[in-house]
């Protein structure tokens, strides 16, 4: 019985070690947004985010291009002031874009979900949920 208990203990320790190590955010990888908080994106809209290794974030906000500085340390991520180009689109796309840009400014930490989705979390509420593009 002792060898079994020792094997079980070692196996459990290995699993805990694996579970505690989060997958990293990939720099210079484009991510495609699927949800803004509690709402999915409008059909056929394409919102993206790339986190450059130089500390600059950028992408497509659905209508306009967006950009911001960001700081990443462990599971904490914060964005500086978010800017964008100023093209006009359909009102529903403009509203979605504003929700996205406001949500980016409220992000405080990140994680990778059990289904390998990048989630950017505000202090309160539901996350922005992204898939790796391509």
Regions found by a protein language model. Name each.
Residues 1-16:
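Sec-dependent bacterial lipoprotein signal peptides
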Residues 7, 18-134:
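Lipid interaction determinants
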């Amino acid at each position: 019985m002792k060898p079994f208990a020792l094997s079980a203990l070692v196996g459990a320790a290995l699993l805990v070690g694996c579970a505690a190590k989060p997958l990293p955010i990939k720099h210079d990888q484009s991510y495609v947004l699927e949800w803004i908080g509690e709402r999915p994106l409008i059909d056929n809209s394409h919102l993206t985010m790339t986190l450059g290794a130089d500390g600059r974030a950028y992408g497509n906000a659905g209508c306009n291009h967006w950009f911001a500085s960001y700081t990443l340390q462990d599971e904490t991520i914060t964005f500086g002031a978010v800017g964008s180009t100023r093209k006009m689109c359909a009102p529903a796309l403009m509203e979605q874009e504003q929700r996205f840009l406001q949500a980016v400014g409220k992000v405080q930490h990140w994680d990778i979900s059990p289904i390998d989705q990048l989630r950017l979390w505000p202090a309160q509420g539901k996350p922005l949920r992204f898939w790796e593009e391509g």
